[in-house]
Amino acid sequence: GTEIGYEGLLDFDGYINFHLSADDLATLVAQGDIGANELTGETKEYDLVTKDVPGISGTATFAARKSGAALVTVMLDGTPDGGMHPGHIHFNSAAETGGIAKTLTTLDGTTGMSVTHIEALNDGTEIGYEGLLDFDGYINFHLSADNLATLVAQGDIGQNELTGESMSYDLGTKDVPGISGTATFEERLSGETLVTLDIEGTPVGGMHPAHIHAGAVADAPGDILITLATVDGSL
C-alpha cells in the first residue's frame, strides 16, 4: 500500500521483467532497469589480459547508474562452454596482489559474461562508480571455484591504470653469456610505477632475484633500495 507516483518512480530502485506466461515465470521475454538504476551513459573500460590459460582475455566495463552505483560488465573471449569462472575485485595492484575487496558474479563460460551491481564492498564499505575509478585494485577471474589458483584473466583498475607514459632501459649481459633484456618503467594514474623486466636467454626453471641499487653501475656495489619481483626463467 505504499504510495508512489511519477516522481517517485523516476527515482525508484527497481527494474521491470516481462515473462513468457503465467505458467512459465522463469522464462523472461524482456527486462530493463528503471529509476535510480538507469545508466547515465558514463563508462570506463579496463583490459583483462590472458594469464594461465592461453586464449582467454577480455574487458571489464564500469557503467555509472543515476544513483551513483556502478554496473560492472565483464566480457571474456575464449572461455569454455559450460565453464563457471569466479571473479573478484582485489585490493592493491596485480603486481602486488591483495585480498578480495568485492565478489563479482560468476562468469558463465558459454556466454563469456558476468554482470555485477556494485554499491558497496564485501565488508559493507560504500563505493560507487566514482569511487571505483579511483580504487586501488585489480580484477581476477579464476578457472573454477575448485581451482582458484589458476587465473584465466586479470587486469588493473582504478588508480592502478597505466597512463601510457613509459621509459625503457637496457640490461646488458654480465657474468652469464647470452642473457640480456630491458627494464620498462610505466606510470600509473596514482603516480606509482609498474616495473616490467623482460629478460632473454634465462634457463628454464631458473629463478633470478632482482633489485634496484643506489648509485651507478660504475660505482657498484650500491645498497639495495628496492627489491623487484623474482624473474622466472621459464617465462
Q: Residue spans of the language-model regions?
A:
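N-terminal leader/targeting pre-sequences
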Residues: 1-235
